[in-house]
Amino acid sequence: MTTAEAAAPESRTFEADVAKLLHLMVHSVYSDKDVFLRELISNAADACEKLRYEAITTPALLGEDARPRITLAIDAEGGRLTVEDNGIGMSRDEMVEALGTIARSGTKAFMERIEAAAGGEKAELIGQFGVGFYSAFMVAEKVDVISRRAGADTANIWSSDGKGAYTVGEIDVAQAPARGTRVVLHLNEDGKAYADRFRIERIVKEQSGHVPVPIYIVEKLDAEPEEIADGVALWTKSKSDISAEDYADFYRSVAGQFDQPALTVHFRAEGRHEYTALVFVPSTKPFDLFEPERTGRVKLYVKRVFITDDAELLPRYLRFVRGVVDSADLPLNLSREMLQDSAILAAIRKGVTGRVLTELEKLAQSDAEAYAGIWSNFGAVLKEGLYEDYERRAQLLNLARFKTTTSGTAADTGWRTLKDYVADLKENQTAIYYITGDLARVEHAPQLEGFRARGVEVLLLPDQVDSFWVTAGVDYEGKPFKSVTQGAADLSLIPLPKSDEAETPEPEAKDTGDFIAFVKETLGDQVADVRASDRLTTSAVCLVAPESGIDRRLEKLLASAGRLGDAAKPVLEINPRHPLVAALAAHGASDSNFRADAAHLLLDQARVLDGDQPSDPQAFAERLMRVMQRGLPTA
C-alpha cells in the first residue's frame, strides 16, 4: 500500500515523556509481542461499536456500508501489516487527542460521555487505557494511521516512529478508507515474522476470535478477503439457541481435546459484578493433570477479548475444568495481561467455583453413572479441596465417592457416599473408619479383619492426597474420620457375631501376657509398644501407628519427600487367638533363643504385610533358616 504525501504535514511532540513510556511498555508491560494485534483489533472493534451507537441517532453515518468488519492485509514483500476497520473513524483533532497523548484513550473518554448521557449505562467498548495502540511499536519501526470520520469529507494521516514525535496532516480521500481507520505497520526486522498468514490467523483465533465484529484477512494485493472470525462468541448466545454439538465443538476448540464434555456449565451472573461463564468438565483425564506446575485452563476474556489463561479463575482442585469467563466490567491496567482489580476477580472466582460444584451436585443426583465417570477421572483432584478449601469442605464431602470394604474395589462396582456410610453405621460405632494405600494391598490388609468380622464398613483411600485431608480435622455429620492403622481400634463396643465368638477359644491369659512382654523386651526400641490386638482375626500380627503419631502411609509419604525427621516407632499388635501365637505363648521360656528369633520374625512379617521390607534382610534370612531347621527332623 502507498500513502499520498500530506500537504504541509504538521510535526508535533507527544505530550508525555513518550520515549521513556514506550520503552517501559515495549520492554516491561507486555511479555508477549503477539498482543499488539489483539490491541489493534480491540481498537478496531471499539470503532465499530462507536459507529453503531452514533448511528442510532444519525443513521446516515452508515451509508451503504452498514455491516461492520475488520480487515487484516499482509504485504510480506513490502514488510507491512495493515489493520483496517469501517468504524467511526477519527477527525484530525481526535487523532491528536487519542494518538498524541499516552494514556488518554479515546475509548475511555467516549465511555465517560456515554455514561454521563445514559445515567451510567455502559457501552460495550473494549479499550480502557491509551497505551494499547502503542504496542504496535514492539514490531514496527514506523506506524501510519489513516482515518476518515463517518460523515466527513476529509481524511487525515498520523505517522510516528514512536521515538517522541509524530506528524499529522490531511490526505487525499482517495488514499483513505471510505469510512473508518487504517493502521499500517512498517515492520521492523523482528516484526517481519508477523507478515505471515498462518501466524496472524493463529493469533486472531487465540486472542480475538470472539470480538463482536467479523475479521477478514487479505494475503495478497487485490485478493478477495477471507473470513477468519465470524464475530460471534458462543457464550453470548442464549442456551436455548445452542445445540449440544455446538457446545461440543466449542469445547474441543477451547480445550484442545477430542472427547465429549462430561458436563457443560453455561450461565450469566448479574448484579454487582456481571460476567458470563461457559466451562466444561472433560470426559477423559488430561495427561498432565498431576504435573506440579499444572494450573487451571479457563481463559479470561474482557468484552470478548482474550486476556489470559493464567488468572486462576478456579481453585487448583478444579484445574481439570476448561472453558472461558467473559467479564464486561473487569478493569484492566496498562496491560491486558495484568489485572487491576483483584477484588472483582475474587468475586468471579467465587461465583464460578460455586456454580461448578453446584452443577456437579445436580449431576450426581440426576445421573449417578455419569457422575461416577467424572469422579473416576478427577476424584483425586477434587479431594485436594477437602484439604485446601475449608469454606466448601461440606459441599465437597457430599460430592466425594469411595470404594469401601462393602462396595469392593472393582471398576464396575458401585461407589459409596458418606451419606450412605453414615446411614449404615453399626450400633455403638462413633467414627468413620478408613485405610489409606494402594487398593490392591489395603483391600487385604490385616488391620481390616476385625472391622470386617463385625460388619463395620471401612473407606479404602488410594490417593496420596487422602493421607492429608483426613488429618485436617474433617468430620461428617459429627462423625470424625479415624484410621484403622493408627491407635487403638476401640472395637470392644461393637460385638462380633455370635458364631464368630464361639469359633475361637480364648487362650490362657497368663501365657499370652508373658509372651507379649517377652516380645516387647526382645524388640526393644524397634517398636513403641507390643500389645494384644482386637482388630486381628485371622492374621498373627500387624503394625499400627501410635495414637499420638501420624498415619503410617502419611509418615511414609513425608519421609520419601524428605519432610520428616525421625519416624515414629510403630506399635506391634499380636493376635492372641492365632494358633501360631498361642503355640509360641504356650512354649514357655525354656528356649529363649528360639522365642527371640520368633519375636523378630513376627515383627518382620508385620513389616512385609505393611508393604515394607525387613529392616535387616541378612538377620531375617538367618533367623528364618534357624526356625526352619528347628522344625525339620534330625538327620
From Swiss-Prot:
- Please, which domain of life does this record's source organism belong to? Bacteria
Q: Which cysteines are joined by disulfide bonds?
A: none
Q: What is the annotated localization of this protein?
A: Cytoplasm
Name the segments for region: B.
Answer: 337-556
Q: Where is this region: C?
A: 557-635
Do you know which Gene3D superfamilies this protein is assigned to?
3.30.230.80, 3.40.50.11260, Heat shock protein 90, C-terminal domain, Histidine kinase-like ATPase, C-terminal domain
Key words, A-Z: ATP-binding, Chaperone, Cytoplasm, Nucleotide-binding, Stress response
Keyword Cytoplasm in the entry? The reply is yes
In this chain, the stretch annotated as A covers 1-336
Query: Where does the chain cross the membrane?
Result: none
Pfam families given for it? Answer: HATPase_c_3, HSP90
Q: Name one GO cellular component term.
A: cytoplasm
Q: Give GO MF terms, alphabetically.
A: ATP binding; ATP hydrolysis activity; ATP-dependent protein folding chaperone; unfolded protein binding
Q: What does this protein do?
A: Molecular chaperone. Has ATPase activity.
**Assembly notes:** Homodimer.
Q: Which family does it belong to?
A: Belongs to the heat shock protein 90 family.
Q: What protein is this chain from?
A: Chaperone protein HtpG
